């Protein structure tokens, strides 16, 4: 055989190892000579096709195992398939039939009926290559021939079969008669059921019992139709493959929906699962009583359903049409133990992508079982603490707050048994052991080899096999290459060890991962009665990690390859030892050169310094807060692990844990904890030493450790029991309580599938994918006692019940979140806010304030100062003031504009007083507080009667209550819209005000969304070669959603910690999304959890202030001087007249394209219907467009039916309170009605009666009942104010408007169309519009930009090409009646490159395209684009050198 052929065979064996089939010896005759002939990779479609040359066609079972294994192994890389090429293509009927189910199974996904037909029969085989199947009729035959025959033949071909032909024959008469009888029986039964239903309905009508939709509530178990007998056969949903005429199923309802049909009947649709699969159940109401009964069917009920299974063309899946539905008792797990345990190791969905059951469901289960306490121990995080605390209160449970931490030792030693030996002069015994496993206690050495090295030269060798006294496992043979024949008859361990000890003498021992090799050597020495080795030891693994921390990994084969050291056969001791020797000498020399290390006892001098924490291997430990001090220390440790010691995962150095141990209890955690590992690998003595550090010892049920047995880290269940018994003995010897914990990741055994899907979604990156996931559901006391029965009844009860409650009793009752609001304190804030407010009021309204002004100020200041909110106003004032001084307007959001104090302290421009005139000269004022005017901006122009100065017009008529509540005690939520350009400056300014240690970005937690979960489920279905029904997909998706995926930060939220406390009083701290290079740290808790405890400033970035600033810079016009009632501007909202174009020119009947809040198609349609002419009407429209069920099906109908006009409808939440007060309702009731309506809760009878009594129109009352959400008027007014200012420029300074729009708001351009004029733009718009829903997001964004470009062109302006010497990096420039686009408008040219071009041209003209590419850092693709667009005319391709 050639070397190339051998390589192909080796590749096949490597493939078998990669897919986990290296130990499958049953099929050795088929695989031993198999080769990978070629691999065809399609990068575009991400598919790999393996062409395998084999002696003969594989058995079907082997083909299936390989197919599944490959799909699983390469799921994150590509879709895989095999093309088998056998030397011998002999086939027979048995082989054809063996493969049949594999071949036709995929057909079931496309046609369940045909799939079932094919699956339920065996094809016959006719020579030479014909297969024959049976069908019922011509339709089935045609369907198979047209849709599936070619695929069946193709699939056989891929499995290595010769080209087959396929025939079909009709079932014989007896078979056909049987089929017809089935269909006839079904038809008769359906007719019988229909007749029975008619009789029942007639009987009800005769007895006058035809119920109404308001039927009496359910008093017993739910039942529609007939009673289903207890002994009726139940079919598993997982066994329903095709249409069935009459079956009974049962399951849990997990979704319900009732739809009212045009016919007046109701359609009940719900989904049930019995955890083998799920199904949609449908039922039509027969009368009003059925319709009323439908309302009683709830999610969470268990039901038994009888009916027929049909193929539903609408959902394209099998569904059941129910005839009878009976509620039944659900399946519940009970805890019948007299004394209950407490679970101390439990994960919530905050354990990232690893746990699925909600905190509420887990805590409810504990309470239902009668447990008194429960712990939370998520991986490294405390993010479930707030929810856990609430659930504990809800269910009466004591909550133990903890984490499962990644603990590390402070630097791992490079050297052991330190001795003052000169490294360059020493003799080294470099050795390696090959073993039967990883445990020095339970496994044995089978090969021991070493070399002696002096001055970099090998001077002696030692090599010996050791007979273990038993056959080697397949894993050992495959990993080491050592076979039974090689070790059989070799010297026993005691002989070899004595020889090795004598050979090694007192020389320095060296090994790669010395802790492993020395662990085996020393344990073996002790077993044969020898002392542990006292030699100086060097670990080349840790030395390499220290010297080269930037290497991706430090495995022996990686390092030898890096340094060109020969490693002939990795995992054979003799070859590993020799390679390690040359590596060690290289490392010793580098240690001297890089760190001046010359002696053995200096090797550990740098241990624990710098990035040493990155080199340490983390192990798990559970850390619990015992006291309030401990809770704060836990928060500090979590912060430290995320900020100072994050590397792949948050890490806690043992030294830091020791420093902050006060108030903490520490447990040994799971199989990844150091105590279990010590017992498994090093034995009792090592485990006892480890146990000294901990407060209690954890053991878990045997199934939790199952992956260790599967991966052969533990030999078998008996060996596992021995380890657990020994751990219990360690507890007895050390006096540490041993507690049985569950390592809970989900509530019930049936929930395991959700975790499997989540873990599978992470592919090879998650080590849990290396073995079958263990059973880690929440176990009852009974279940746990049964799991530990092997310890004896008494000991089992001690560790399950007694000790778990003992640990609970150690813990104080703790509250991880505060009850009160803690705002920062600024000395004199109250006086400053009061003085500012009155100062500005006097400046505007005169020395003697109008009564309405003074009353409003006093009312607000009393609430603001009385409840400690003055500091919040002062901080907001400082932020806004700085922005204004720096030249950027600030827009207010939310309801802050409802506060007159906010207006007077310049936090908002919105004035909430009733509409009024105000003289800027003599301070005279005139108020309209009767509701006759909607906005002061709508008042007609008027001169002051006292001094003749034109009046200013102000006031939006907004009650203060909508901001701070009726009692004025609601925490103010001041949202401010800063320019997007200025936002980082505003954020940084908060650090100046409060100090860096007291401000943090508001943290957020990103969880698995429904769409993402759907992808996970479908990928799992594909990779596991499954067919999952649609309803089952929905269930699995629901089970995977809500699990933490990542963390982030609120776009503008800044959390302020008062300086008389520190952040750990409220929350740990971390970086967003674990980005350790982030400029800001965030709160570890989601900001909603601490929203009511600390001040949150909403410093948001917005385009409007940026646009206003650019317009001001271009025009020199102060935006505050722009009139709010300009007639031409107001016309813009109802026609295109002000633009000088016709509606057909711009495909819009209004001129609001590009105007914030009014440019979308939806709002433009509202404008067309309502034809607003005033500012207050624009505020109405802003409110209507942002609310839910405020416009559609509500105000829209009222206006269309002429019930009322635009000013009269309910637009914003504040309108309700103001209108009702004007109608005569008491203000507190008016406020309650407003709050109820805006939250979608409708009206109570009391509210409705009061409204009717005060002559509130009935249409108004009905409108209130429909509303789900409402916009605050202050928010709407602030938005409209900005919109009107921008609209002013669109009408009167159009090129300023367009230059600003394209610079600030647009991201996607089609410069080719824009430069080529109106027809080109319209053609591109048509292309996008013709795509309809298929248009991409980028194309839809481009369409919006092109609409504005088309309008600009229609108004007589045009676009120039990008100009190499005129264009800006990132702003459109006005040039006469045209705009010059910036460089970053070129596709794929980023702003950084654009700035580079501008910087380069300032250093001189470009000599050539080559010069532009080099100096401007521009890609060839961009150069080509610019050349095609004519931007580089006259520029040669390359620099030219003239010699004369």
From Swiss-Prot:
SMART domains: EXOIII, POLIIIAc. It catalyses: DNA(n) + a 2'-deoxyribonucleoside 5'-triphosphate = DNA(n+1) + diphosphate. One of its GO terms (biological process) is DNA-templated DNA replication. It comes from the Bacteria. It is found in: Cytoplasm. InterPro entries: DNA_pol3_alpha_NTPase_dom (IPR011708), DNA_pol3_finger (IPR040982), DNA_PolC-like_N_II (IPR024754), DNA_PolC-type_N_I (IPR028112), DnaE2/DnaE/PolC (IPR004805), DNAPol_HHH (IPR029460), DnaQ (IPR006054), Exonuclease_RNaseT/DNA_pol3 (IPR013520). Keywords: Cytoplasm, DNA replication, DNA-directed DNA polymerase, Exonuclease, Hydrolase, Nuclease, Nucleotidyltransferase, Transferase. Its EC number is 2.7.7.7. It is an enzyme of class 2 (transferase). GO terms for molecular function: 3'-5' exonuclease activity; DNA binding; DNA-directed DNA polymerase activity. Belongs to the DNA polymerase type-C family. PolC subfamily. This is DNA polymerase III PolC-type.
């Amino acid at each position: 055989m050639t070397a190339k052929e051998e390589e192909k065979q080796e590749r096949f064996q490597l493939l078998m190892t990669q897919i986990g089939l290296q130990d499958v010896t049953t099929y050795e005759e088929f695989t031993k000579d198999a080769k990978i002939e070629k691999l065809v990779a399609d990068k575009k479609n991400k598919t790999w096709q393996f062409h395998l040359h084999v002696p003969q066609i594989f058995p079907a079972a082997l083909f299936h195992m390989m197919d599944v294994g490959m799909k699983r192994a390469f799921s994150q890389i590509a879709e895989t398939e095999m093309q088998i090429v056998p030397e011998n293509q002999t086939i027979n009927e048995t082989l054809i039939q063996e493969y049949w189910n594999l071949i036709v199974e995929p057909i079931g996904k496309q046609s369940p009926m045909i799939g079932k037909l094919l699956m339920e029969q065996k094809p016959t085989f006719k020579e030479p290559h014909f297969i024959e199947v049976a069908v019922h009729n011509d339709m089935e035959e045609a369907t198979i021939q047209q849709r599936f025959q070619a695929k069946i033949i193709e699939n056989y071909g891929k499995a290595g079969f010769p080209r087959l032909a396929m025939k079909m024959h009709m079932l014989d008469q007896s078979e056909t008669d049987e089929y017809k009888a089935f269909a006839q029986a079904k038809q008769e039964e359906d007719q019988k059921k229909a007749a029975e239903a008619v009789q029942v309905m007639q009987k009800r009508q005769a007895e006058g019992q035809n119920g109404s939709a308001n039927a009496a509530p359910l008093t017993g178990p739910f039942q529609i139709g007939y009673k289903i007998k207890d002994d009726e056969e139940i079919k598993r949903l997982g066994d329903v493959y095709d249409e069935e005429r009459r079956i009974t199923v049962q399951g849990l309802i997990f979704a319900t929906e009732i739809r009212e049909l045009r016919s007046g009947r109701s359609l009940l649709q719900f989904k049930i699962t019995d955890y083998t699969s799920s199904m949609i159940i449908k039922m039509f109401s027969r009368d009003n009583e059925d319709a009323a009964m439908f309302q009683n069917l709830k999610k969470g009920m268990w039901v038994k359903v009888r009916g027929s299974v049909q193929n539903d063309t609408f959902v394209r899946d099998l569904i059941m049409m129910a005839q009878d539905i009976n509620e039944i008792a659900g399946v519940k797990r009970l805890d019948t133990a007299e004394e209950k345990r407490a679970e101390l190791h439990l994960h919530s969905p905050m354990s990232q992508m690893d746990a699925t059951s909600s905190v509420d469901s887990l805590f409810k289960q504990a309470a239902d079982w009668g447990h008194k306490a429960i712990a939370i121990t998520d991986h490294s995080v405390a993010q479930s603490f707030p929810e856990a605390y609430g659930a504990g209160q809800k269910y009466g449970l004591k909550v133990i707050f903890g984490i499962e931490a990644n603990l590390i030792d402070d630097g791992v030693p490079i050297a052991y048994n330190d001795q003052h030996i000169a490294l360059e002069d020493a003799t080294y015994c470099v050795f390696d052991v090959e073993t039967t496993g990883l445990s020095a206690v339970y496994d044995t050495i089978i090969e021991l080899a070493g070399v002696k090295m002096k001055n970099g030269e090998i001077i002696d060798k030692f090599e010996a096999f050791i007979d273990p006294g038993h056959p080697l496992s397949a894993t050992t043979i495959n990993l080491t290459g050592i076979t039974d024949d090689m070790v059989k008859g070799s010297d026993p361990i005691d002989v070899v060890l004595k020889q090795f000890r004598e050979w090694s003498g007192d020389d320095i021992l060296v090994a790669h991962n010395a802790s492993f090799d020395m662990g085996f050597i020393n344990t073996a020495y002790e077993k044969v009665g020898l002392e542990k080795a006292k030699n100086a030891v060097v670990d080349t693994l840790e030395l390499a990690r220290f010297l080269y921390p930037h290497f991706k990994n430090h495995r022996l084969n990686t390092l030898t390859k890096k340094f060109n050291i020969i490693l002939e056969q990795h995992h054979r001791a003799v070859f590993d030892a020799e390679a390690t020797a040359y590596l060690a000498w290289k490392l010793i020399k580098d240690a001297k050169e890089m760190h001046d290390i010359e002696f053995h006892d200096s090797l550990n001098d740098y241990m624990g310094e710098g990035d040493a924490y990155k080199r340490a291997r983390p192990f798990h430990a559970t850390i619990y807060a015992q006291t309030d001090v401990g809770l704060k220390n836990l928060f500090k440790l979590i912060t430290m692990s995320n900020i100072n010691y994050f590397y792949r995962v948050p890490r806690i150095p043992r030294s830091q844990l020791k420093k902050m141990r006060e108030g903490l209890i520490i447990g040994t955690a799971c199989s990844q904890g150091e105590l279990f590992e010590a017992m498994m690998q090093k034995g009792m003595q090592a485990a006892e030493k480890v146990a000294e550090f901990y407060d209690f010892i954890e053991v878990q049920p045997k199934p939790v450790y199952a992956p260790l047995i599967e991966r052969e880290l533990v030999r078998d269940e008996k060996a596992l029991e021995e380890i657990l018994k020994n751990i219990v003995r360690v507890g007895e010897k050390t006096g540490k309580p041993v507690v049985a914990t569950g390592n809970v990741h989900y509530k019930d055994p049936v929930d395991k599938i959700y975790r499997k899907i989540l873990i599978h979604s992470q592919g090879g990156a998650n080590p849990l994918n290396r073995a079958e996931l263990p059973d880690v559901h929440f176990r009852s006391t009974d279940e746990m006692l049964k799991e530990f029965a092997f310890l004896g009844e008494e000991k089992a009860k001690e560790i399950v019940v007694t000790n778990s409650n003992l640990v609970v009793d150690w813990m104080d009752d703790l509250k991880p979140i505060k009850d009160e609001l803690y705002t920062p304190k600024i000395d004199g804030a109250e006086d400053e806010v009061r003085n500012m407010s009155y100062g500005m009021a006097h400046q505007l309204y005169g020395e003697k304030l109008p009564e309405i002004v003074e009353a409003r100020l006093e009312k607000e200041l009393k609430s603001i100062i009385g409840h400690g909110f003055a500091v919040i106003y002062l901080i907001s004032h400082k932020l806004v003031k700085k922005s204004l001084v720096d030249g950027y307007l600030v827009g207010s959001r939310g309801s802050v504009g409802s506060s007159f104090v906010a207006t007077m302290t310049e936090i908002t421009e919105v004035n909430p007083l009733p509409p009024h005139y105000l003289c800027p000269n003599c301070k005279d004022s005139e108020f309209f507080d009767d509701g006759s005017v909607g906005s002061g901006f709508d008042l007609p122009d008027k001169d002051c009667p006292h001094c003749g100065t034109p009046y200013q017009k102000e006031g939006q008529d907004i009650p203060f209550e909508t901001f701070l509540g009726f009692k004025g005690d609601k925490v103010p939520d001041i949202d401010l819209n800063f320019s997007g350009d200025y936002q980082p400056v505003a954020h940084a300014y908060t650090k100046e005000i409060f100090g860096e240690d007291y401000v943090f970005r508001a943290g957020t937690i990103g969880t698995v969304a429904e769409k993402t979960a759907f992808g996970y489920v479908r990928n799992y279905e594909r990779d596991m070669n499954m067919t999952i029904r649609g309803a089952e997909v929905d269930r699995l998706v629901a089970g995977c959603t809500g699990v933490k995926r990542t963390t982030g930060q609120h776009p503008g939220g800044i959390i302020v910690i008062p300086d008389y406390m520190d952040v750990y009083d409220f929350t740990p701290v971390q970086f967003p999304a674990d980005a350790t290079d982030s400029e800001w740290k965030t709160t570890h808790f989601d900001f909603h959890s601490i929203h009511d405890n600390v001040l949150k400033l909403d410093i948001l970035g917005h385009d409007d202030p940026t646009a206003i600033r650019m317009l001001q810079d271009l025009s020199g016009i102060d935006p505050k001087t722009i009139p709010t009632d300009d007639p031409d501007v107001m016309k813009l909202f109802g026609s295109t007249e002000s633009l000088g174009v016709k509606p057909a020119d711009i495909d819009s009947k209004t001129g609001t394209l590009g105007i914030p809040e009014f440019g979308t198609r939806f709002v433009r349609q509202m404008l067309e219907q309502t034809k607003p002419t005033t500012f207050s009407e624009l505020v109405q429209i802003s409110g209507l467009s942002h609310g839910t069920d405020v416009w559609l099906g509500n105000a829209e109908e009222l206006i269309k039916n002429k019930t009322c006009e635009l000013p009269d409808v309910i637009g914003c939440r504040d309108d309700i309170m103001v209108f009702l007060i004007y109608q005569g309702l008491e203000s507190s009731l008016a406020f309650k009605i407003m709050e109820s309506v805006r939250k979608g809760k409708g009206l109570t009878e009391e509210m409705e009666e009061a409204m009717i009594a005060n002559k509130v129109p009935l249409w108004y009352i009905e409108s209130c009942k429909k509303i789900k959400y409402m916009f605050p008027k202050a928010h709407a007014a602030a938005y409209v104010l900005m919109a009107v200012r921008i609209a002013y420029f669109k009408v009167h300074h159009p090129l300023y408007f367009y230059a600003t729009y394209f610079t600030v708001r647009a991201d996607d351009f089609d410069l080719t169309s824009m430069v080529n004029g109106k027809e080109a733009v319209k053609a591109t718009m048509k292309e996008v519009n013709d795509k309809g829903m298929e248009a991409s997001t980028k194309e839809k964004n481009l369409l919006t930009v092109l609409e504005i470009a088309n309008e600009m062109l229609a108004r007589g302006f045009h676009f120039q090409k990008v100009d190499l010497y005129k264009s800006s990096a990132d702003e459109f420039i006005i040039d006469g009646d045209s705009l010059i686009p910036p460089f970053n408008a070129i596709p794929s040219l980023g702003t950084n490159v654009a700035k580079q071009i501008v910087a380069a041209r300032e250093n001189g003209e470009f000599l050539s395209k080559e010069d532009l590419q080099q100096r401007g850092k521009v890609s060839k693709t961009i150069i080509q684009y610019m050349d095609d667009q004519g931007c580089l005319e006259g520029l040669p391709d390359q620099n030219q050198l003239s010699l004369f």
